[in-house]
A protein has these predicted regions:
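C-terminal motif of bacterial Sec signal peptides marking the signal peptidase cleavage site
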Residues: 15-18
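Bacterial N-terminal signal peptides that target proteins for export
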Residues: 1-7
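Metzincin-family zinc-dependent endopeptidase catalytic domain
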Residues: 45-151, 163
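Metalloprotease/metallohydrolase-associated module, dominated by Zn2+-dependent proteases
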Residues: 119-147, 163-203
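Bacterial Sec signal peptide processing site at the extreme N-terminus
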Residues: 20-31
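Fold-level signature of zinc-dependent metallopeptidase catalytic domains
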Residues: 30-43
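Catalytic glutamate of the conserved HExxH
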Residues: 151-159
Length: 203
């Protein structure tokens, strides 16, 4: 009888510890994601600051990192450009839980799209993912920095699990091989509500 009593006490204690751990995990999950802006060395520092400033208007938890070299393994010699998926893989290795890294470059970047082995793009972000990359190479001269910011915030959205959005003014609009950034103004309400479920704390 006494043995059963001790066994019951042990089970209760283990259950309490388990509940405590679950509560701790919930507290950790409630922390907002921190966006790390990672410029590559080809980037102008003023452009990096502009993009970071624009992101902060929407989402305040952000830090600019020191500029680094583009990873050598991402260079695609045949087309004189860089593979976006390789850049993302490189950045992801150095991105821990609770952080998302956005790489910024002026160089041309590409990825495989369907039957096209090397398709030039403005940016790439996997859904979900720890990192993404945006390039200014394919942007027009008018409002170039503003366009660059919109490409960056679009790719960050993908890392958080957002799909392309049918709302034409939303940052998550599908470019469809074009550059619709001048028509984009903000995340739509549906996309914002989704980001809130990912612990985004909007201003």
């Amino acid at each position: 009888m006494r043995r059963n009593k001790y066994l019951f006490i042990i089970v209760v204690l283990l259950w309490c510890c388990s509940c405590s751990k679950k509560k701790d995990l919930n507290i950790l999950n409630d922390k907002p994601v921190i966006i790390l802006v990672q410029p590559f060395k080809d980037m102008n520092s003023e452009t990096t600051k502009f993009i970071a400033f624009e992101i902060k208007k929407i989402y305040p938890h952000l830090k600019i990192l020191d500029a680094i070299d583009l990873p050598k393994e991402s260079y695609y010699k045949e087309r004189n450009r860089y593979r976006a998926d390789s850049i993302i893989q490189y950045l992801s290795k150095n991105t821990t839980n609770g952080f998302v890294t956005i790489g910024l470059t002026t160089k041309d970047i590409s990825t495989t799209k369907g039957a096209i082995k090397d398709f030039g793009i403005m940016g790439l972000g996997f859904k979900p993912g720890r990192s993404c990359v945006a390039s200014s190479f394919r942007l027009t001269l008018n409002n170039k920095n503003d366009q660059f910011f919109k490409v960056a915030i679009h790719e960050i959205g993908h890392t958080q699990g957002l799909k392309h959005c049918p709302v034409k003014s939303c940052f998550m609009r599908d470019a469809e091989g074009k550059n619709p950034t001048d028509e984009e103004t903000d995340f739509c309400n549906n996309c914002k509500n989704f980001l809130k479920t990912q612990n985004w704390k909007f201003k």
